[in-house]
């Protein structure tokens, strides 16, 4: 009997250890892990520089209250600010906390300038921003909110890719538009660059803040440090998590000077956010991923992967409907049963995970090797042949 709550439908497999792109199960099997904790282990399992960072910091200081200065946090905040649009950073522990904090930052900004009624957040219907109460109501998904009433108010929703739907939902009380630059759980849907630029124009015209959720698609996952960079758009607020910790729990809200002005002492806090252990790991991750050569390689390997997947799609059009994504955030939309496909991949020692719209989500580590991509392509092709 397991004493864990039943809120996960766990597969009957557990792992003893991981190394790089691979996981080793307790029953002695080796798996190519293209889930990586759902885009968390950005540098694979047990990366030596991250292991060293944890070991080194663990011998000095694990935790200290944010009532005091934390040099490791100051260092990571500076690196993030220098690399991005941000002027200020506020650390959390997870993606859901980061999106919740982003909502607070947006509402608090308008409150601080004498517009307390300007507090509504406009989001994409059936998006994903986390599992906390505000985050599930921000998603606009009945599946996520069922049974968790009363409703958390202050959110409006528009259809993905429908600018007319968006414009109709904007009111004088709209504080921010919050979207995932690439929808992950929603089926690997990339918001086009022109669309992001249009969102920025709308926000500028209507005095609305732009929040771009990069919890899953950020920190090099797209081939750029942030997925929105290609569009040249500057958001006001960006929540991040997952990849910045390389497997260690870290979340953060990046914000410009204007919106940060509302976050005065006492307006938000986090007991564990920005702790020295997490910051030590985050600094190591930043040093590796922010390197131009590293990001260039992510783009190169992802182009190679996508081209090979599209060849499989052309060979098995009855199985694969579409290959989509950017960088190493890839979706295979199927014409066949998703659960069965993922199970067959797993039977062939390749781990993947589902997304909405019958999509198989593929999330290799950003430092994945070419021969590991080749191995995965071979397995995917084999499964397509079996199901054809």
PLM regions and their residue ranges:
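Conserved N-terminal phosphate-binding loop of PLP-dependent enzymes in the Aspartate aminotransferase
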Residues: 1-388
């Amino acid at each position: 009997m397991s004493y864990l709550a039943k809120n996960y439908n766990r597969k009957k497999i557990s792992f003893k250890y991981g190394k790089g792109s691979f996981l080793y199960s307790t029953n002695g099997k080796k798996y190519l892990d293209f889930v990586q904790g759902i885009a968390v282990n950005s540098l694979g399992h047990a990366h030596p520089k991250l292991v060293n960072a944890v070991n080194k910091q663990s011998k000095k200081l694990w935790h200290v209250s944010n009532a005091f200065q934390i040099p490791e946090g100051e260092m990571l905040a500076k690196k993030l600010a220098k690399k991005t649009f941000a002027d200020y950073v506020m650390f959390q522990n997870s993606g859901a906390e980061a999106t919740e904090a982003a909502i607070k930052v947006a509402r608090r900004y308008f409150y601080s300038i004498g517009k307390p009624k300007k507090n509504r957040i406009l989001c994409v219907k059936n998006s994903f921003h986390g599992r906390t109460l505000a985050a599930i109501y921000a998603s606009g998904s009945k599946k996520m909110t069922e049974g968790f009433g009363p409703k958390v108010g202050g959110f409006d929703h528009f259809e993905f890719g429908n600018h007319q739907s968006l414009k109709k939902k904007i009111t004088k009380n709209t504080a921010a538009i919050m979207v995932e630059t690439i929808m992950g759980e929603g089926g690997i849907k990339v918001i086009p660059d022109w669309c992001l630029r249009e969102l920025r124009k709308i926000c500028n015209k209507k005095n609305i803040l732009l929040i771009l959720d990069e919890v899953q698609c950020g920190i090099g996952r797209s081939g750029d440090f942030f997925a929105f960079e290609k569009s040249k758009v500057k958001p006001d607020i960006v929540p991040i998590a997952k990849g910045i910790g390389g497997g260690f729990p870290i979340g953060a809200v990046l914000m410009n000077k204007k919106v940060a002005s509302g976050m005065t002492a006492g307006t938000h806090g986090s007991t564990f956010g920005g702790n020295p252990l997490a910051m030590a790991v985050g600094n190591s991750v930043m040093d590796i991923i922010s390197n131009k050569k590293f990001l260039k390689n992510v783009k190169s390997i992802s182009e190679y992967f996508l081209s090979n997947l599209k060849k499989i799609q052309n060979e098995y059009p009855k199985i694969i409907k579409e290959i989509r994504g950017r960088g190493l955030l890839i979706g295979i939309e199927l014409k066949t049963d998703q659960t069965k496909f993922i199970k067959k991949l797993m039977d062939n020692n390749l781990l993947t995970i589902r997304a909405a719209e019958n999509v198989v989500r593929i999330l290799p580590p950003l430092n994945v090797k070419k021969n590991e991509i080749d191995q995965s392509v071979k397995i995917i092709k084999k499964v397509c042949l079996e199901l054809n």
